[in-house]
Amino acid sequence: MADLNINIGKLKFKNPVLAASGTFGYGIEYSDFVDLSKIGGIFTKGITLYHREGNDYPRMAETSSGMLNAVGLQNRGVTYFIKNIYPKVKNIETNIMVNISGSTIEDCVSCAEKINELDKIPAIELNISCPNMKQGGMAFGTNCSNASEIVNAVRKVYHKILIVKLSPNVTDITEIAKAVEIAGADAVSLINTLIGMAIDIKIKKPILSTVTGGLSGPCIKPIALRMVYQTYKIVKIPIIGLGGISNSDDAIEFILAGASAIQVGTYNFIDPTISTKIVDGINAYLDKYHLLSIKELVGELL
């Protein structure tokens, strides 16, 4: 059996298959029917400094080859997480990483500072796709200056592994990736959801209460692959690839394009055990082609 171990900075993962934020709860919800120790890591649902109610319903819609969501980062805040969720997840036998976001840089910094104190949380994933309320609602991750500013601020207070989740809703994602690398990111994860919408033709109204939402699922995979491939040529830090992954072949494509690890997102709603199946599939692929380590595949597109 091949070696599936990978490293993001100084953090070691038993394999490159990770559960994406917002699709796997805090992990503990699935412990009765998924062997969490077989997954390389779990990114928690998004956590903010304060309690958030999220958006009005309806806030999810199925599409022909994916789904739209506009949940709006509903969560009970970082203090609730620390007091009530952390004690339940800290002993799960895999890397539990917290996805954080905020409406201001100050909120993100405060949230990161609190998570930094948790011994059993080795990394955070900073979501920079959220609107910056001090800049007219423009998302932090849509220009290099804002992206660099927020990553630099979080880096000053967060002393473990800092992963930055990039938005695909930009002209050139490689410029943003390079900016956050320079600002201190240990890795980048890409891509987050694309902006889309759906319409109910019977009532002539948008299906989502917010009109638009984040598009995910198989339909975005070719775009995600292209962006991972382009980014791999530009940055030196590890890339975590995500977007439409539903089987081990998809995962291997991302790794060949340059991803050191992958995240499974939307498909968790269809099959919560998919991550363990992908691990088995990657193992089988490496054995079939007589490869000794997953590292031999990263960026090896001919």
UniProtKB/Swiss-Prot annotation:
Names of the cofactor(s): FMN
Gene3D superfamilies hit by this protein: Aldolase class I
Cofactor stoichiometry and binding remark: Binds 1 FMN per subunit.
Positions contributing to FMN binding: 21, 45-46, 99, 127, 165, 191, 217, 243-244, 265-266
InterPro entries: Aldolase_TIM, DHO_dehydrogenase, DHOD_1B, Dihydroorotate_DH_1, Dihydroorotate_DH_1_2, Dihydroorotate_DH_cat, Dihydroorotate_DH_CS, Dihydroorotate_DH_I
Enzyme class: oxidoreductase
Disulfide bridges in this chain: none
PANTHER family linked: DIHYDROOROTATE DEHYDROGENASE (FUMARATE) (PTHR48109:SF1), DIHYDROOROTATE DEHYDROGENASE (QUINONE), MITOCHONDRIAL-RELATED (PTHR48109)
Entry similarity comment: Belongs to the dihydroorotate dehydrogenase family. Type 1 subfamily.
Catalytic activity line of the entry: (S)-dihydroorotate + NAD(+) = orotate + NADH + H(+)
Pathway membership: Pyrimidine metabolism; UMP biosynthesis via de novo pathway; orotate from (S)-dihydroorotate (NAD(+) route): step 1/1
EC number: 1.3.1.14
HAMAP family registered for this protein in UniProt: DHO_dh_type1 (MF_00224)
Function: Catalyzes the conversion of dihydroorotate to orotate with NAD(+) as electron acceptor.
Domain of life: Bacteria
GO CC field: cytoplasm
Keywords for this protein: Cytoplasm, Flavoprotein, FMN, NAD, Oxidoreductase, Pyrimidine biosynthesis
GO BP annotations listed: 'de novo' pyrimidine nucleobase biosynthetic process; 'de novo' UMP biosynthetic process
Binding positions (substrate): 45, 69-73, 127, 192-193
Oligomeric and partner information: Heterotetramer of 2 PyrK and 2 PyrD type B subunits.
Catalytic center residues: 130 (nucleophile)
Subcellular location: Cytoplasm
Protein known as: Dihydroorotate dehydrogenase B (NAD(+)), catalytic subunit
GO function terms (MF aspect): dihydroorotate dehydrogenase (NAD+) activity
Record carries keyword Transferase: no
